């Protein structure tokens, strides 16, 4: 049962990440950075949650993306190579979109982190 759930999370995360990438490929003046940011943050959560499920941890028992990420660090310390704390919007409760979704450059950073986490999860 969890395998299907994990596969669905990865599939949904990939679709959302692809949409964010497509948005960023538009001319910069046409990019809706808030849309990219929100989609990418949901992607981060999906991939992190999929990793936890792969490791028999129910992500719903953890209150935030940060708590889930920190649990990933306990399971696999190499997650520290992917530093989601560098995102200005992250705090102990998760993402505050109003603090971050202002420029294409910043949402591009978030997209890169989501890609790195996807790679880590798929390869694990």
Regions found by a protein language model. Give the residues of each.
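Terminal alpha-helical segments
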Residues: 1-124
